């Protein structure tokens, strides 16, 4: 009787790969009044490191502008993780890398953005959760349509 191998999904390491903050109009920008327009962009990526090990990145870029022209700040964070995935079917591996891993990483990226912006002298930026499953489904549909 053969023993079935159990699937393995584990977090091996979480780390900040890149963190940058620019306040191009300091110190004058702190004297200006008004509600900033905040724009957030999120991207994900993954790469296989070696058998069963993958690196996943979630990059969050937040730009705040006054009157849609003067940049208050530009903050970019790449939160990364090394994940171990073994004995998992390939289609499930892609789902884990595109949905589960980014869901694990995003709260860390969100905290890094909020903390960095606050330490720069601005009010905290509260980023809404991201539906990585919907993004993954859209990417799958776009790839299927292009094939």
Swiss-Prot record:
SUPFAM superfamilies cross-referenced by the UniProt entry? SecB-like
Which family does the record claim for this protein? Belongs to the SecB family.
Q: Name one GO biological process term.
A: protein transport
**Keywords assigned by UniProt, alphabetized:** Chaperone, Cytoplasm, Protein transport, Translocation, Transport
Species of origin reads Neisseria meningitidis serogroup C / serotype 2a (strain ATCC 700532 / DSM 15464 / FAM18)
Q: Which GO terms describe its molecular function?
A: unfolded protein binding
Q: Subunit structure, per the record?
A: Homotetramer, a dimer of dimers. One homotetramer interacts with 1 SecA dimer.
Per the record, the domain of life is: Bacteria
User: Can you name a GO cellular component term?
Assistant: cytoplasm
Q: Where in the cell is it found?
A: Cytoplasm
The name under which this protein is listed is Protein-export protein SecB
Job of this protein: One of the proteins required for the normal export of preproteins out of the cell cytoplasm. It is a molecular chaperone that binds to a subset of precursor proteins, maintaining them in a translocation-competent state. It also specifically binds to its receptor SecA.
Keyword Disulfide bond present in the record's keywords: the answer is: no
